[in-house]
From Swiss-Prot:
Belongs to the P-Pant transferase superfamily. AcpS family. This is Holo-[acyl-carrier-protein] synthase. It comes from Mycobacterium sp. (strain KMS). Its cofactor is Mg(2+). The gene is acpS. It catalyses: apo-[ACP] + CoA = holo-[ACP] + adenosine 3',5'-bisphosphate + H(+). Keywords: Cytoplasm, Fatty acid biosynthesis, Fatty acid metabolism, Lipid biosynthesis, Lipid metabolism, Magnesium, Metal-binding, Transferase. GO terms for biological process: fatty acid biosynthetic process. It is found in: Cytoplasm.
Length: 130
């Protein structure tokens, strides 16, 4: 396996929290029902957990875009919803892809790490391909 893309993203949690449920924002249709359910089940702010997932989605897009250096961008409409951040029973995150991005990255392995500290959420994504 070779690393073909790396992405990172930072999110201001207070700014994100103001917009996440506002009708007409990009965030309204971004998160899957599973992501919203997982965030609502957390003991702290749902917005805090969704902000980290937004950062992960953005990091995956940046890693994918970087893997396509010197190639035409291929960002399908609604791409954020096609990138779902799921966690196992111990809270370890993994990315599940659907739609066009799943087809583009069908042979790839995506590693993702999420964090939040204070008012900031962050994520890093690494894409490996054979």
């Amino acid at each position: 396996m070779a690393i073909v893309g790396v992405g990172i993203d930072l999110v201001s949690i207070p700014d994100f929290a103001e917009q996440v449920d506002r009708p007409g924002t990009v965030f309204a249709e971004t998160f899957t029902p599973g992501e919203r359910r997982d965030a609502a089940d957390k003991s702290s702010s749902a917005a805090r957990h969704l902000a980290a997932r937004w950062a992960a989605k953005e990091a995956v897009i940046k890693a994918w875009s970087g893997s396509r250096f010197a190639k035409r961008p291929a960002l399908p409409e609604g791409i954020h919803r096609d990138i779902e951040v799921v966690t196992d029973m111990w809270g370890r995150p993994k990315v599940r892809l659907t739609g066009d991005i799943a087809e583009h990255l069908r042979e790839a392995t995506i590693h993702v790490s999420l964090t939040h500290e204070g008012d900031t959420a962050a994520a890093v994504a690494v894409i490996e391909e054979p």
